[in-house]
Amino acid sequence: MARQVSLEKTRNIGIMAHIDAGKTTTTERVLYYTGVSHKIGEVHDGAATMDWMEQEQERGITITSAATTCFWRDHRVNIIDTPGHVDFTVEVERSLRVLDGSVAVFCSVGGVEPQSETVWRQADKYRVPRIAFINKMDRIGADFDRGVNMIRERLGANAIPLQLPIGKEDNFSGVVDLVEMKAIVWDDESLGARFEVVDIPADLQERVDSGRELLVEEVCTHDEALMDKYLGGEEITLEELKNGIRKACIDIKIIPVLCGSAFKNKGVQNLLDAVIDYMPSPVDVPAITGVVPDTEEEITRPAGDDGPFAALAFKVMTDPFVGQLTFFRVYSGVAESGATVLNATRDKKERFGRLLKMHANKREEIKQVYSGDIAAAVGLKLTTTGDTLCDPANPCLLESMEFPEPVIHIAIEPKTKGDMDKMGQALGKLVQEDPTLRVRTDEETGQTILSGMGELHLEIIIDRLQREFKVDANVGAPQVAYRETITKAVEVQGKFVRQSGGRGQYGDCWLKLEPQEPGAGYEFVDAIKGGVIPREYIPAVGKGAEEAAENGVVAGFPIVDVKVTCYDGSYHDVDSSEMAFKIAGSMGFKAGAAKASPVLLEPVMAVEVVVPEEYMGDVMGDLSSRRGRVLGMDARGGAQVINSNVPLASMFGYATELRSMTQGRATYTMVFDHYEQVPKAISEEIVARVKG
């Protein structure tokens, strides 16, 4: 089967936003207008096509990024709907990695909210071109100009409106298109599928003229040929203006802004047009780079069907009907179902079973995938998120993804022996799907410990264990992922000697332990001169120290941000071994850490609370009682926004508390910010609790 749509006519985009900005609804409308779904799915009916896991339909939020494909103006648009809840930022990170462009949806009332900032920073990191869509223009308190200004101020982005709204709140009826200089009004009866072009309303003419001037000037600033024409007083044609916007948008020099109300079916077709007109095709973005495995030689894989096959797996899911589904993005080349590919990350060959094009949770079987496609494969056994799949004859390793460390964990115990076996398999599958979920066994208690990005994240994992995998388990209260560190430098000897007849053991090293900058992690430095410890034993010292750091000296939490330098020692010709030096390194580290004034560290979260004025005092008082530090306040659409840093340990159950304190009128978001030292009194309580 030949390629249906050329690369130039392919768009891979994500839809990203804060929770409740209306992202899934926007995607639903896109699917409706492009003719993929014949009935509009509403999120609050629990019927949205993209939200297909049971938990998503119950909670009305999007958890996994479903990939779907649709057509508009002869172009193929692959859309990835990403979750907006902060516990699921990894989903956003992994989808941004494989997109060429993104639509950022903002709520016209709330404007730029904390999660929007997090997602925006992730998109900056991967240099993803964006279009902004200010949604919910029909809501009370809708304010387009404030939305545009917040994108400029809070996100530091050059937001340039391509449209202005006609009316607002209940009177929102259409938009003025500043590119084509025409007014568009939607017809409510045809669900917004029909619209008419009318004269620009006289009361808007002045705003429209200045908006148009700003747009033309801004586009010309980034294009010399257009600038010369503009300064020479010549008229810039529609085609030149559109090309200029496209170029500036792809280079992330401007962020085009559109507006509408997806729920009321207004503005979605224009958004689709903008995706086609201004978002990059796979050919317009820089070619992806990778390295040749083993040689570290850098290579690029430009988009095109002629090159060798190279793809990145960005999501693994367990599907009740076909088993494991691996979603991947093809960067170059072509592959057929049944083909053998190399997983360059693991250096193992895999075979594509069936290849599927996904439409939320419906699937269409395909025979081939081409450069620029996003598809799913059945039958890959070893591949996990972030792995590279490539042509075995032309191996190439694309850069993988980085995932944040989990901040919260819970203990979980299966109720019966039967559940025990099922739980092991189920957790194995879930970890493969979600790299931010960690599973380990606590050696002392024998409990299974799950670590994740937040309470909601772990709640949903437990829920899936019960629903999808039918595992019954007792779940402990969530625990904070404390860490330990040292606060002063020490020098210490680690010596392990056993010499009582026969082959003995002898390892002797001198270590210097120094505190590092927060976030620097563990570092081992070899400063041995003159062979006082033979080369081959030095890594063992480092390994011993690193393993000892897993269980700290204050309360058994991992020790972080420490630099260990091995600078002296001695050895025995016969009795020294790697094992002996590993034990010596471990003994030295433990002794040193205990002397180096060790302290407990706790995760501190950036908490933003949006609260009506009358509850302000209560909420501030409550944050202080949770050891929170208020960093600042500002007004946003009739409510107050409080920014603060609060230790995670004091935030358990905050959602319920906040709801009852403000009669459900306040909302909050929480993102991990940094680790900091625990106050002495609280540290003593924690130690007593752990050792008790």
Curated annotation (Swiss-Prot):
A Gene Ontology biological process term: ribosome disassembly
CDD domains noted in UniProt: EF-G, EFG_III, EFG_mtEFG1_IV, EFG_mtEFG_C, EFG_mtEFG_II
SMART domains noted in UniProt: EFG_C (SM00838), EFG_IV (SM00889)
Alphabetical UniProt keywords: Cytoplasm, Elongation factor, GTP-binding, Nucleotide-binding, Protein biosynthesis
GO cellular component: cytoplasm
PROSITE patterns (alphabetical): G_TR_1 (PS00301), G_TR_2 (PS51722)
Single GO term (MF): GTPase activity
Superkingdom assignment: Bacteria
Keyword Cytoplasm among record annotations: yes
Compartments where located: Cytoplasm
Domain tr-type G intervals: 8-283
Residues binding GTP: 17-24, 81-85, 135-138
Record family assignment: Belongs to the TRAFAC class translation factor GTPase superfamily. Classic translation factor GTPase family. EF-G/EF-2 subfamily.
Function, in words: Catalyzes the GTP-dependent ribosomal translocation step during translation elongation. During this step, the ribosome changes from the pre-translocational (PRE) to the post-translocational (POST) state as the newly formed A-site-bound peptidyl-tRNA and P-site-bound deacylated tRNA move to the P and E sites, respectively. Catalyzes the coordinated movement of the two tRNA molecules, the mRNA and conformational changes in the ribosome.
UniProt-recorded name of the protein: Elongation factor G 2
Gene name per UniProt: fusA2
